[in-house]
Amino acid sequence: MRKLVNANIMKGFFRSTLLLVAAALSVVSCSKDGERGRLSFEKSALFFMAGETKSVKFSASDVRSLTISSKPAEWGDPVINTETKTVRITAPAPNTEGAAESGTLTITGRGDNGRSVSASIYVSISRTVDMSDRPANSYLVNSRQTNYLFDAMHAGDGTTALETARLQIIWQRPSNLIEYLTLDEEGRASFFVGADDDDEGRIKQGNALIGAYDTKGNLLWSWHVWAADYDPDNRGTVSFNGYEMMDRNLGALADSNASSDDVLNSFGLYYQWGRKEPFIGPGTYDFSNGTSATLYDDEGDVVSLSVEESSAETGTVDYAREHPLTFIAGVEASEYDWMWGSHSEALWSDAKTANDPCPYGWKVAPAAAFAGLTIADPLEGVSADEYFDKYGWTLTDGSAESLFMGAGRRIYLDGRFQNIYVNPDSERQVRNVAMYDQPWVGLYWTTDISSSQSSAFYFFFNKLHVENSRVEGPVLHYRANGMPVRCVADR
């Protein structure tokens, strides 16, 4: 349990709106003759402003003599009302010295069999950020110990209504990134993101996908949550060709290639052209085993990706939306697009679309945003060893510069990672297993299209002749490929 014992810390902490985050946990006591007592809280989360008093309902069956067993330090004494079946609790007032930032509130009673039964609520002092007025398919969150809200009754365009009955974490990395996910009374998704395990002053970083389901269990929509210690509105952008561009990939947790961990965290997520659903990056920075990073569900169990070939059934926008864990592989009959029929040119465009994967106020970059970029790193007279493990170039337009990662792609045929320098116009795009995962090329989807293919920004590292490494600009690629994305401001 983390405590605030310094008055100055408390003073700064309480300047913002405060919340009480409560996770409900019920415990059942049973006797040999089958009699049992049950006790549980109604909600998984309850939010308070500083000093505010609220009540939370509980349910009790065959339970008597309820008492408070524990509460966090300096929280108001909870009051149990057995008639209304509520517990009233007060969050600490601002600047309360010695108040615990988090802890456990527990009520205990006796079942009719005489055995103890209890229910516990984890409580935490936090602030809230309501993003309901910023509809998008992804939400960038960057504050630690914070409860976030977004509209879960409308799709990412903010207008298409959804009959959302419940929410569920489809995948997350790391495990337990998203806590206390609920659908509140106003139809908002409510979730909590805590602090970094090694640095309490920073947000716990990672990515997650939250799904909205109807009463029959059908997946209606999904939203990407990008938790990162990054604020594009606070010197987190670079200006190229009149476009204000994020200085890192969508879903990236860093923008550095100083270490292998930095490289891996800077790759970000991968997208099939026109899809809003992200795919996780590789498990290792050097693509050594060609496999994905491990994903988890809300129970901490491992979640697996699948691959389906495009067909009349699978190659549709609806199927893609309903199967966010499925990489839809291109086939010859679909011209290696994940879409089977018409090659939709409206999924992504220069104007932000309903399928755009970028956060509110941002959109997928067009090819024009990358025009004229060249490698800023010195290439003459240097050894390949100097760049072999860097997996990225610093690119410049002559005035501004930004690091772009050589993150390769998920290849269109099977979704496997491929990161190798090879002329993208040649017939040698498809390599055998032994040729996979060699350093390294950079590929970024743009919104530009040509017939059944789309344009990707492309650069490479030539490990045999470093001086021949270069940016080749936009190159057409099959749309079933999975590639990183850079977002530009949609002002």
Short names for language-model regions:
Residues R2, L20-F47, G114-S126, C487:
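Bacterial Sec-dependent N-terminal signal peptides
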Residues K3-L18:
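Bacterial N-terminal signal peptides that target proteins for export
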Residues R38-F41, S59-R88, R127-D197:
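Surface-exposed binding patches on compact interaction domains or structured appendages
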Residues P92-G98, D196-R202:
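Short, surface-exposed loop/turn segments at beta-strand-coil junctions that are enriched for proline
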Residues A99-N113, K204-T215:
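A short beta-strand micro-motif common to beta-rich folds, especially ectodomain repeats
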Residues D130-A161, A212, G217-F267:
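GGW-centered surface loops in extracellular recognition modules
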Residues Y180, R188, G206-A208, P232-D377, ...:
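Short aromatic-cysteine micro-motif
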Residues A252, A329-R491:
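C-terminal, surface-exposed recognition/capping segments
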